[in-house]
Amino acid sequence: MATSKPASIAMISLGCPKALVDSERILTQLRTEGYQVTPSYDDADVVVVNTCGFIDSAKAESLEAIGEAIAENGKVIVTGCMGVEESVIREIHPSVLAVTGPQQYEQVVLEVHRAAPPKADHNPYVDLVPPQGVKLTPRHYAYLKISEGCNHRCSFCIIPSMRGDLVSRPVGDVLSEAERLVKAGVKELLVISQDTSAYGVDLKYRSGFWNGRPIKTRMTELCAALSELGVWTRLHYVYPYPHVDEVIPLMAQGKVLPYLDIPFQHASPRILKAMKRPAFEDKTLARIKRWREECPDLTLRSTFIVGFPGETEADFQYLLDWMSEAQLDRVGCFQYSPVNGAPANELDGAVPDEVKQERWDRFMAHQQAISAARLQTRVGREIDVLIDEVNADGAVGRSSADAPEIDGCVYVGNAATLRPGDMARVRITAADEYDLHGDAV
């Protein structure tokens, strides 16, 4: 008896790694139901666009992607953070089939069913989905989302209005997913959330179970358990709460990568207060010094905003001086951009665009010099490098100091035998502002 052809889905995933995990979850469910995933508009029965709505430029990119999908395919379902602005989307693109917000996985799947019904004779026991689900990253690393939402109300941010308050995943579920990923060949787990250090607060840190033993739903205990899997564990989106000090010994012992991604956003106490950043009075520089004393190889990554309403030249100079003292390893910087619905829009003291640009240029030049000097200290050392790509010129990988896509790379010569996913020992021979160069040994 002839069988029906399975429907095909194309997915466009925009924005942060947290949105990428949402896309993976949607695709995994659809694959379980027999849908095929295609990278082509032409072969897709319907296109799902997972949007970003964090800042205006991200919204513009999302609207452009929706328009392209409509032009190339015609049957488009919109989801993700910008989905909370359905009226805006439908005003510009009235032909979209459906619009859903973030975390509405079941609704997205339902809308896909309506647009392209699943294959009636699909047998899930024959067409198996791998235990780790559908992944959109290379097979040797994966994002591990531990919670959704955020309890903070930073004045420049609208994420809580889109994704709600903090909801932590059960620790047993997180660890079981991590275990499946490692069994599937993942060499690096990138722990993500809106606020990783708040993991478990909403659950009052109650214990869950993994492999028959109790584990507290808390960042430190989660990291200790993840270290048992024998792969790199990298922490992202960590706020500098006091208990963050507890993970530094795990890093010093080699159980967790010596890498902390902490979005400081600014250094001026006055601007931090206007931003309504948590723990803005912390003596952060003193803590950074203590962390590095305990774990000398610690890499610190952060992001900053310049040109925030009310930022004076004195505030900006305070930030530059703080950067000189902090000696952060990896830094991103954004010019402040008003976000529809953010309380910061009501603040006085808007900074002119040309001043924002000038401060951004100075900030990046300042940090570039710091980065170059810090990377220079690695020349002559041997380090472990996880290989991401192999080409005619050699291999490209990342050290413990480099998260994918946002940090630098290690360019590796003498790499004829290396393959993506290999862990190579590399002697560093040169460094520039952001990257290292070396040879496999």
Curated annotation (Swiss-Prot):
Its main location: cytoplasm. The keyword Transcription does not apply. It catalyses: L-aspartate(89)-[ribosomal protein uS12]-hydrogen + (sulfur carrier)-SH + AH2 + 2 S-adenosyl-L-methionine = 3-methylsulfanyl-L-aspartate(89)-[ribosomal protein uS12]-hydrogen + (sulfur carrier)-H + 5'-deoxyadenosine + L-methionine + A + S-adenosyl-L-homocysteine + 2 H(+). This is Ribosomal protein uS12 methylthiotransferase RimO. Its cofactor is [4Fe-4S] cluster. InterPro entries: Elp3/MiaA/NifB-like_rSAM, Methylthiotransferase, Methylthiotransferase_CS, Methylthiotransferase_N, Methylthiotransferase_N_sf, NA-bd_OB-fold, Ribosomal_uS12_MeSTrfase_RimO, rSAM. It is found in: Cytoplasm. Pfam families: Radical_SAM (PF04055), TRAM_2 (PF18693), UPF0004 (PF00919). Belongs to the methylthiotransferase family. RimO subfamily. Binds 2 [4Fe-4S] clusters. One cluster is coordinated with 3 cysteines and an exchangeable S-adenosyl-L-methionine. [4Fe-4S] cluster 2 binds at residues 150, 154, 157. Residues 136-373 form the Radical SAM core domain. Residues 376-441 form the TRAM domain. One of its GO terms (cellular component) is cytosol. [4Fe-4S] cluster 1 binds at residues 16, 52, 81. GO terms for biological process: tRNA modification. It is an enzyme of class 2 (transferase). NCBIfam families: 30S ribosomal protein S12 methylthiotransferase RimO (TIGR01125), MiaB/RimO family radical SAM methylthiotransferase (TIGR00089). It comes from Bordetella petrii (strain ATCC BAA-461 / DSM 12804 / CCUG 43448). It comes from the Bacteria. Keywords: 4Fe-4S, Cytoplasm, Iron, Iron-sulfur, Metal-binding, S-adenosyl-L-methionine, Transferase.
